[in-house]
Amino acid sequence: YFVFLFVFHRWNCNQSDKEPVDEEDADPAINPHSSYLEEEESGGNTSSGPAFPVLANYAPAFPGAVGYGRNADGARGSNNREIYVVTNLNNSGAGSLRDAVSQANRIVVFNVSGVIDLNKEVLVFKDNQTVLFQTAPGDGIELYNGRTSSTNANNLIVRYMRMRTGRQVSGSDNIDAGGAAYGHDQIYDHCSFTWGTDECFSLNNDKQPKGLYNITLQNSILGQGCQNHSCGGLVQTSDKEGVTVFRNLFIDNK
């Protein structure tokens, strides 16, 4: 089943509307301070649209999470979770974002802001991760000159990520700014995927046996594809459950 709800609206991509994370919160994955979608739930129904699947014994990823991926719990459900603080803008090494997402079961927060040059490499997310870009101070974090992948990641929460791929990545015209080929229970919220040279964000199972299901992409921007054929997104999931694409802005794609 597929749920596609496209509501095009003005979305301020500046970091001025990002939510602060109070220092007193011991676990930012449990209380990531979001209230973007006002809901009145009754058996999965909301005031903002039709019923989405809700597992009765599961808390949503964060307040305002909707759709098939809303029950992803990131690192929250892991008994051996740890909080990793990104302390520099390096592409690799201790304190870098790449090092932060190299291991499963992590809540990733930031005490640095600026541009991270991925050096034409893929940033790969792992199982049971909660990556909270809105915790960065100042103007936040921007990823550049590379791409992200959530392939084979299960129980993933990514919020407020800004990915700018660019034409120069490997000299190729078939690079997506982000996406996944297989995996389940993933949610992306208030992200922007731009300057892709194939699609900006793709969920392409392509008959992979592991499947791609229980995914939500919400409140995000997919735009400014860099090639004549570049598109906003490609969605081809497996037969299990589905994908929710909700309240996103697709703009300036071919």
Please describe what each predicted stretch is.
Residues 7-48:
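Bacterial Sec-dependent N-terminal signal peptides
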